[in-house]
Amino acid sequence: MNKKRKPLELYVHIPFCIRKCAYCDFVSGPGTKAMQKEYEEALLAEIDAAEETAESEVISVFFGGGTPSAVDAGMLARVMEKLRSKYIFSEDAEITLEANPGTLDAEKLKCYRKSGFNRISIGCQSVHDEELKRLGRIHTFAEFQESFALARDAGLNVV
């Protein structure tokens, strides 16, 4: 962190998920590919329109939702690329992605890492499959464990 710059933290809302969980109060829900593309275009335009902040330095970016891992990994990569073109990032900026174990695979995780994500929050919610069903989750505890291992293998060391 450059001592002369003010720390800046960014939140990027990705409102899409596979299906809305019974307990979720966030603005989110399933969306078509066309809706996701339209949202991406609006998000990129919003970043373009944001004020230049040469006196600030990004120390963290958090992608929440919804379930950011439910959308195409390329979309998140393009958003990160746009953010990096607009803002100054600290060398050790924390870039976090919220994820559902039922939406992760090795290819997506490698794309996230390549795009600069260095932290992932994988929502397990419970280690009991029956509870996961009651909560409306789309994964099992075994799928969470597999996703955790895949995230580590992809180089995401903060899981």
Language-model features, listed with the residues they occupy:
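Generic cytosolic/nucleocytoplasmic N-terminal low-complexity/intrinsically disordered segments
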Residues: 1-3, 19, 63, 85
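N-terminal [4Fe-4S]-dependent radical SAM core
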Residues: 1-11, 26, 54-55
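Short glycine/proline-enriched loop/turn "hinge" motifs that connect secondary-structure elements
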Residues: 4, 15, 150-152
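Structural motif
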Residues: 7-9, 21, 94
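Alpha/beta-hydrolase
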Residues: 12-14, 124
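Local cysteine-cluster metal-coordination motifs and their immediate loop/turn environment
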Residues: 15-28
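Conserved non-cysteine loop/helix-boundary elements of the Radical SAM core domain that shape
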Residues: 28-54, 58-159
